[in-house]
A protein has these predicted regions:
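Conserved structural elements of the adenylate-forming
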Residues: 16-38
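Conserved AMP-binding loop of ANL adenylate-forming enzymes
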Residues: 35-70
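Active-site glycine/GP-rich loop and adjacent strand/helix microenvironment
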Residues: 68-349
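Short acidic, glycine/Ser/Thr-rich loop/turn "cap" segments at secondary-structure junctions
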Residues: 12-19, 42-50, 87, 92-94
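Short, charge-rich binding segments
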Residues: 6-9, 34-41, 86
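Short glycine-enriched loops at secondary-structure junctions
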Residues: 24, 51-53, 100-101
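Conserved adenylation A10 loop of the ANL superfamily
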Residues: 1-17
Length: 349
């Protein structure tokens, strides 16, 4: 084992993934294929605006671009004005980011008085969260680049499982390394080609953490007719949803059970809460409304602020993203006679 990455898990502890040297070489090869399919070339200068660290996205794309001989700017995420400065001064021709962060970059470009013609961007590889054709069109219009989707998950390898080519008619799967199946999410039985269901993947060459029929919980379908680009690998359609309750917020996997675990560990917090996800501008916003046990706490501004800060800090440790926390009166949130519907996702993706 030469490297370890991790993804979010339902318990709040990360799911740890191990890689051998052969795994890293295979990962680089898979990423290089998808980068070239998306239009990437040796002559490109690529800015990677994924966060570096245990998250697989940044290093996965990084080593793929280096494999094809491109110049890599490991900008990481955040400090967006600096990102734009780097992009302009270093002449970046390719951008790697979540689609929502790509759109936020476009807003900052505009605020800084920079025209898209002043940038040299020509392609964008976007992933880690769902995106619509409309979102891609906006990225194209605002940044002047050609956007493509790519797909992966840490348990399988990270990014590099599948990606769009320049014809954008499904994501080509590296099926010599990852064997895909579609199953009915209720019966768990395989279904016919072209039907929508849950994607299941078996790793064929991975050594550090092989997976046999791993349920991704992602809903898609397989496309087996020949692509106009000439590649003959099977393709998968855009992800249409999940078969579990996982949310993807700013590229991070978030489970309601993680949030509940944090809230229920705090004696001042009551048992009822709601989770609201919305997209403000082009960035996802996570808001958690939660009842306090003692209504008197709401009249003590100092104690209230301290508790909000404490809840936010604990959530940040578990979720790895910031959340807005609102403390409300006991018995003020909606009650449910059946299964509680605690999550409201207002994003239109």
């Amino acid at each position: 084992i030469v490297r370890v990455h991790a993804s979010s898990g339902t318990s709040g502890k990360p799911t740890v993934v191990a890689y051998t040297k052969n795994d890293l070489d295979m990962w680089s090869d898979c990423m290089a294929r998808l980068i070239v399919a998306a239009g990437g070339r040796k002559s490109d200068i690529v800015q990677i605006s994924f966060g570096y660290g245990l998250f697989t996205g940044a290093l996965g794309l990084h080593q793929g671009w280096e494999k094809i001989g491109a110049t890599v700017i490991p900008a990481s995420s955040g400090n967006t004005e600096r990102q734009v400065m780097l992009m302009k001064d270093l002449g970046a021709t390719a951008l790697v980011a979540t689609p929502s962060y790509g759109l936020y970059i476009s807003e900052v470009v505009e605020k800084m008085g920079i025209k898209k013609e002043d940038l040299k961007l020509r392609i964008g590889l976007f992933g880690s969260e769902a995106s619509s054709p409309e979102m891609h069109k906006e990225l194209q219009d605002k940044l002047g680049l050609f956007p493509t989707d790519n797909y992966g998950l840490s348990e399988i390898i990270g990014p590099g499982v599948a990606g769009e080519c320049e014809f954008k008619c499904g994501m080509h799967i590296n099926e010599d390394h990852f064997y895909p199946e579609i199953i009915d999410k209720e019966t768990l039985q395989p279904i016919e080609d072209g039907e929508w269901g849950e994607l299941v993947i078996t790793t064929l060459t991975k050594e550090g953490l092989p997976m046999l029929r791993y349920r991704t919980k992602d809903i898609t379908r397989l496309i087996k007719d020949k692509c106009q680009c000439g590649r003959t690998t099977v393709r998968m359609d855009k992800i249409q949803g999940r078969s579990d309750d996982m949310l993807i917020i700013r590229g991070v996997n978030v489970f309601p059970s993680q949030i509940e675990g944090v809230l229920m560990s705090m004696p001042e917090i009551g048992g009822n809460y709601e989770i609201i996800v919305e997209r403000i501008g082009h960035m996802d916003k996570l808001t958690i409304n939660v009842e306090v046990k003692d209504i008197g706490l709401l009249d003590n501004y100092s104690k209230l602020e301290d508790l909000v800060k404490k809840v936010k800090q604990k959530l940040k440790v578990v979720l790895q993203i910031d959340a807005v926390v609102r403390l409300v009166e006991p018995q003020s949130l909606k009650r449910f006679e059946g299964k509680a519907k605690r999550v409201t996702d207002l994003r239109k993706i």
